[in-house]
Amino acid sequence: MKKKAFDYEKLLLFLLCIGFSFLFYGKTIAVENVNYGVEQLHQYNHELFKQNIGLMEDGFSPRYYANVIVSVLMNLLKMSWAGVATLIIRANFIIYAVAAARMVCKVTKERRLLFGAILVSCMFRSSLGTLAGFGLNGAMDVFIGTGTALVLLGISFLIGEKKNWMAAWICLSLATLMHVHEGMWGGCAVGVIWLTVMIAGKKIDWKTLKGLPVYVVVMLLVTVPALLHGEAVDETLFAEIYVNIRTPNHLLPTAWGTDVIVKSFLLLLIPALFFAIRYWKDRSETKSRQYLILSILSMALWLLIFAVQYFGTILHPSSTIITMYLPKCFKYMAYFAMLLYLKIADLLFDEERYLQSAFAILVLLLGCDYSFAVTMLCAVLL
């Protein structure tokens, strides 16, 4: 039996993505880490910050397991919190890079190196927008970045012909341990892919759900103790403080700006139109049908998240909806859009429609800009 030749191009792709990722590495630890750092240091030494308002005196933090990891690493490696945080941040960049390299291998066979550089750049710049202030680039945040990176890695196991659902569920479970919101909304993103595959195949493959119980158990371990120790709050007062005063940029839809909201949805709509036209012209294009389904489901989830967030913060304030941080899901829909634009560029290049392929890449690189979005729309319709 002939041995399969070693794929040096794939190795080069992984090295390129890792090297390119670290071009976006910051020289300082993000200030957001200080909030979680209080919990992590308190886990390391319970005598620290005992009266800090950020600690749950009688409750259970959803970040408990992540805090334990930091504490264990500090003891094991004999390092300061800053040293351990730096190691985790560097690991985040590597996981991001591996996720990007794996994804590019699934999207194209001919233009891996080019697409690898493009995807890494777009991920770390959040090129398709940061609706509600949540972008894909969280690598400089301890554990938020780890959770996001693990979700992206999990998604990379589900694109293309060969899918590894167990690996994806494990990545989601680990992401949940790192940060509950990333695990939760990453799970919704994986759910979109699962529905896409099931609808396209016109049947439910129960084998794909073998790893789901692991994910559910981890989610329960993280969320149930915190919910059991919850206290009754005045919903209106909570919304006023938490949404309107503390984080309107993240949680209040009316603070995001109509312009940003429209652009965000438009960037999801264009790939859907492209694959709809492609499938309408040739019904044998099964791949186009799958990408069309993915586009439609992504838009449907986007609209659902926006509607629920609007209802739960403005029309009928709900502390449950507010603390779930639903808008974090938008960044995963933006990631799907990135992959769809890469696929569009790849298909158009194969068909020697180089100008249109370039437009797709320009939209991907420049993101939320009406002029390029409209140009791409015209290119799609030609």
Regions found by a protein language model. Give the residues of each.
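Active-site lumenal/periplasmic loops and adjacent helix-entry segments of GT-C-fold
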Residues: 6-10, 18-120, 131-147, 177-182
